[in-house]
Amino acid sequence: EPEKREWLKFAFTDPERLKPSQTRQQLTEQVAENFAELSIRLRKSGHAPPAVAHFINRLVFCMFAEDIGILPNRLFLKLLDAAVKSPESFEHLSAQLFTAMRDKNGFVGFERVPWFNGGLFDSAETLPLSGTELKRIRAAAKLDWSDIDPSIFGTLFERGLDPEKR
């Protein structure tokens, strides 16, 4: 496999090239800051702090679940790709996904969606996002969330309630 041979070559000839551009901590901090900014914008547009915190945790959970393989076929990234092209569709598309995630026999189109219990997806409630916000979320979704510290969930929930928290 050419890619593996290339990595092996770099291990001996250019090991610096194999170092991640950001540490796990730096990546987690960057993501937390981006979502804190989103939280502030959503609260300023009149959404209640608990609804903002819950919504942001849903988004982050979807990204994490996708990258560890429990949300199939890049389903959330595909949703974001469609919503970036048509921002007014985001609420409908995300509500469909959230509904499927709370259903033991959930589907989005022809895609089977695993059931996620625990309360995060008890409702299909979602919040509207602008095209710019959707592009930022899509950029975040393209990161490898398996490299991000899972403790970010608690941090983002707290920031959704009070964005001034660090």
Describe each PLM feature range:
Residues 4-166:
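Preference for the N-terminal adenyl/adenosyl cofactor-binding alpha/beta module
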